[in-house]
């Protein structure tokens, strides 16, 4: 069994305590076993769709999908894949807003298993420590690599950063296109969904909140 890093355990425990963890079963199967079983079930699904799996183009598709699910687009279900985090003492006493904009993300709608394609803006006001900027992107990507709803994804990113940085002063906004809306159902090709989660001063201070929302508006503009 893989031993989780301290940071991964802290984030997982914080999400569980707040009821924000992705719904997961307790049983954890070995990755190779999961890939084998997923491939078997995908073979059955494709056969029920009347696809000919003896065709060269389709023969390996169940195995490709299984590998993609376990190792790539759903890798964020396994905290062993939580990014290595570098937290640095705030020796410079930075106390102004730090913002990372235009963080690209691709996730999967947990209702229809189709794409959520979006961008995130993340801000925080440092307290005792700061985080390597690329780590913010990696945390966004980790939680995006799960079956998701956008509301939970936004809150998971915020709570993870609050936990790691030791401050409530974190804000996250995600603007995304949902292919469950674009490619099926109503087939609206132009609508986007924006979800914002605010913590600490971003929620209690009107000036801080407006500064963050201006950063989001600047990106959207």
Curated annotation (Swiss-Prot):
GO biological process: one-carbon metabolic process; tetrahydrobiopterin biosynthetic process; tetrahydrofolate biosynthetic process
Main enzyme class: hydrolase
EC number(s) given by UniProt: 3.5.4.16
UniProt xrefs under InterPro entries: GTP-CH-I_C/QueF, GTP-CH-I_N, GTP_CycHdrlase_I, GTP_CycHdrlase_I_CS, GTP_CycHdrlase_I_dom
Coiled-coil parts of chain: none
GO cellular component terms listed in the entry, alphabetical order: cytoplasm
Pfam family, one: GTP_cyclohydroI
Pathway as given in its UniProt record: Cofactor biosynthesis; 7,8-dihydroneopterin triphosphate biosynthesis; 7,8-dihydroneopterin triphosphate from GTP: step 1/1
Transmembrane feature ranges: none
Catalyses which reaction(s): GTP + H2O = 7,8-dihydroneopterin 3'-triphosphate + formate + H(+)
Keyword Iron-sulfur tagged: no
Molecular function via GO: GTP binding; GTP cyclohydrolase I activity; zinc ion binding
This protein's UniProt keywords: GTP-binding, Hydrolase, Metal-binding, Nucleotide-binding, One-carbon metabolism, Zinc
Binding-site positions, Zn(2+): 109, 112, 180
Signal peptide coordinates: none
Database matches in NCBIfam families: folE (TIGR00063), PRK09347.1-1 (NF006824), PRK09347.1-3 (NF006826)
Family: Belongs to the GTP cyclohydrolase I family.
Subunit structure: Toroid-shaped homodecamer, composed of two pentamers of five dimers.
PANTHER family for this protein: GTP CYCLOHYDROLASE 1, GTP CYCLOHYDROLASE I
Protein name: GTP cyclohydrolase 1
Annotated source species: Sodalis glossinidius (strain morsitans)
């Amino acid at each position: 069994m893989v031993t989780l890093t301290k940071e991964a355990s802290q984030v997982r425990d914080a999400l569980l305590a707040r009821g924000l963890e992705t719904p997961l079963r307790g049983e954890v199967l070995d990755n190779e076993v999961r890939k084998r079983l997923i491939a078997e079930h995908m073979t059955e699904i494709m056969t029920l769709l009347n696809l000919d799996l003896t065709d060269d183009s389709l023969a390996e598709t169940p195995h490709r999908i299984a590998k993609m699910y376990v190792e790539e687009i759903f890798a964020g279900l396994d905290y062993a894949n939580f990014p290595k985090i570098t937290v640095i003492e705030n020796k410079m006493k930075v106390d102004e807003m730090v913002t990372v904009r235009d963080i690209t993300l691709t996730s999967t709608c947990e209702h229809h298993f189709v794409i959520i394609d979006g961008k995130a803006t993340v801000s925080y006001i440092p307290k005792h420590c700061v985080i390597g900027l690329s780590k913010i992107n990696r945390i966004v990507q980790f939680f995006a690599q799960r079956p998701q709803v956008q509301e939970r994804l936004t809150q998971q990113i915020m709570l993870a950063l609050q936990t790691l940085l030791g401050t409530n002063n974190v804000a996250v906004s995600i603007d995304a296109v949902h292919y469950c809306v674009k490619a099926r159902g109503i087939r609206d090709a132009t609508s986007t969904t924006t979800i914002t989660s605010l913590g600490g001063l971003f929620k209690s201070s009107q000036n801080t909140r407006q500064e963050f929302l201006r950063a989001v508006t600047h990106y959207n503009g």
